[in-house]
Amino acid sequence: MEPGPAHRRRRPAVACSECRRRKIRCDRGFPCGPCRKSLPALSCIYHSQPRAYAASAPPRPHTAQHQPRPKVNNTHSVDLTKFNLPSFESDAFHGLDQFGIDWQPSWEHQITPPTGHLADAGADYFQSPTFSVIDDHEKKESTNHSRARQGYPGSTETINPGSVSHSAGVNPDSGDDRWYQILARIGKVEYLIRDITRHQSSDEAQLVPILRDLYEAEPDECLRLPPLSGIVLKLENQARLQKQQDDKQSLARLSPLLDASSKIHQLLPPRQACKKLVSAYFETFGSVLCILDTAVFTSEFERFWEAIDASRVPSTDHEEAFAHKLLVVIALGSVTCPSSPGAASSEAERARQTSRRNHAIMCVQHTRQWLAQKTARGIRADLDVAQILCLLALARQTQLHTDPWPRRPSMDGTVILTGDHDLARLGMQMGLHREPRTGSMAKPAKEAETELRRRLWATMLELSLHQYLDAELPPPLGADSYDCATPSSNGVEEEPRSYFVPDSLRVPASTVLAALSRTQRLRLRVLEHLHASGASKDIQESQRLAIELSQAFNSEVNSLLSPASTQPTSFQLWLLNVFVRPFILALGVPLSGESRNRFADYYLRRLRLENAVAMLRPGPHEDGPRSIQSQISSHAGQTGSRTKTAATAYPFLPTPGTAEPCNTSSEQHFGTHKAACTSLYIGGPSYYAVVHRQVVASLCADVVAEIEDDMFPNLDAAMLHRIVAILEDAVNEYRDQVHASAGAHACHEFILFAAAHSLALASLNRSSAREVKESVMSSVWMALHHCCQAMGEPAEAMLETEWGTEAVQQTATESQSVNRSVSDADKGYEIDAQLQGVKYMLQQQSDAASTADGEIADMWAFDDDESYLSVGLPL
């Protein structure tokens, strides 16, 4: 019997099929670099790749999102040690290897590396998500998925943070790339988006050459980024690296306060600053969500500081719980406190703001560490623990938490973070979802406790609804599975006095929470319709729920804005819209597989436009003259003649020497609370910033489609002009953020939204195709010019050119200047001297804890020359 053919071992392919065909070097990535950079994008396939080798290759972005989530187990105990959580991502601690292990040896002072808890606290601050390239292949894939792939404000992100190294220049503060896909619905700016996202995975040393090759290879009708964009992205990467280094230094100096031997009062700011931060919390988050009883909190605050003055430490469980409530309240209050007017762009002020934010992260981490220790000993949830968990959930939405936002699905299991409990399920285990049975002879104290439980249940359910919407999970309870009454609109406790809004102009937080509570059952039905298995997902049911929820919510808003009643603040209206309208927008995304109906598409687009405008302009008092009266050319915004916006003109924190209360005019009240909103939704990776980016992108795409359809030109003319004006204000807010952060934040948003706004404005003015193209490219050029100025580099010195037919030729003649600006001295990305920030360093002391304690006092010391508003609580 003759032997068979010799066995030949299959070996992995050394190059993909496309690289073999093109006879070029393949980097064996998945996809490889040449296929990723090609235009149009090529299919990167390894034909001889065995299964084992294919499984070991890194996954493509967007792959993990479509995997099923682990089911949430039911719980029958309030013991937090056995309490299961909803699905959270397994990569929440991505980036720890670059945070607490390899410290830079070139630092000026020897700094003690942070502890593991500090690394947890900073993990979210140094996230390195990957922005995918929106090519034709991915667009075809996206049409085959369900509603979750379409995207809506508050939906889950589509990025894979482990696919690109941190040094690739990826934005660590964006948090999502869903807004890229939403904005890519505008066909004329799609290539601009592809260019700016393609840079995120490109070799840093080849940014400009790659872009020049792409620009020359495309037809003339394509709108492409100018070569200056490569330099801007390089400078942006340098600014972020400098910011990360400053964050590491600041967090390392504060890390000794997480030791078991440190006392909690060492983390607290001075008493005067602590009062202002507590006041800022109650004027913002506390004016919507009734987590704390304000009267009880005020009295306990006074007793707490008396104990500190007497050198007494918290001894009882209740005193410890209050101390950690205070830590998280201070952290939340610091987030809504912008800098002083005119100082936001200075390096010293940016260093102080960085230190304050890192201090807030440490306060939240200290509370999580305390809660973990209590949980290990078998703590049982009571009202104090429930309040702390609500505050931690709110801190997670503001990105003062290690849980990155939005959450990403994963089939590798879930990461359980201390304090990340399913609040709705916990509330049911505590019995908060049941209405207490009280008789007619109930005592006042019992009535107050009953009202507190109602408010706490409404707050816990409200915070949980957004977890379910973001994680695409069905709720653990139905719309009719709880009978807890709506919180009373009239406060039982006495509201704390505030100079922000006098009592005669104040809407109690209980009134706003009651309005939210009356829409919660409808939103539970929306979640069941969207994510429950076996639920009907036809477009008619989605439209019916959207109409019902819109009508119910509009009725609540109209009652709050009634001329006969007290008007809510702009922050209350903004947060109210952010909590409810993303559910309507989720219903406005068409399902895949549905037959396209032009009239249905038109209705859904109008629905998205209505809700996006309401979220960007929540109150009628915002319909007046805009804060920035600039046209498209003002996107560049000369820094010397910038008009002060509400985001910088009305900060919260006062000067201690100022004794008189502030002016109570409605304009000043609007500016004060508008500043708090802007500090939350502009820049950074918080939930509010993610929602805001997606809302602006949705508004850009829908208004351009509305202008192009031109179905009702006479009726819609005024409306479209108003929407374009709202977009202009949003672009200018991102422009101000670029200037305030020295280019570390919002560069991509500013460039792309400026291009979309210019396209909408030119199309609305009936410009020709050539004029539209020139307008868009002029706006992009001016936006890049402003980014260079914000980062301390004059654009004229790097690229002397105007947009026209000779742009590419002029770029080639000045390649020496471009290459000199782009090249790095070494692979460690040494920061140029002009981008060096003022290092906020204390002199080295022997006791690290006392050094950190002194730094906290310095960062919260207010100078007399800072024009802060006079704000105070009777604490």
UniProtKB/Swiss-Prot annotation:
Residues 54-73, 136-172, 620-642 are annotated as: Disordered. SUPFAM superfamilies: Zn2/Cys6 DNA-binding domain. Residues 153-168, 627-642 have a biased composition (Polar residues). It is found in: Nucleus. It holds the Pfam family Fungal_trans. PROSITE patterns: ZN2_CY6_FUNGAL_1, ZN2_CY6_FUNGAL_2. InterPro entries: Fungal_TF_Env_Response, Transcription_factor_dom_fun, Zn2-C6_fun-type_DNA-bd_sf, Zn2Cys6_DnaBD. Residues 16-44 bind DNA. GO terms for cellular component: nucleus. One of its GO terms (molecular function) is RNA polymerase II cis-regulatory region sequence-specific DNA binding. One of its GO terms (biological process) is DNA-templated transcription. Its main location: nucleus. It comes from the Eukaryota. Transcription factor that positively regulates the expression of the genes that mediate the biosynthesis of tenellin-type 2-pyridones, iron-chelating compounds involved in iron stress tolerance, competition with the natural competitor fungus Metarhizium robertsii and insect hosts infection. This is Transcription factor tenR. The lineage of its organism: Eukaryota, Fungi, Dikarya, Ascomycota, Pezizomycotina.
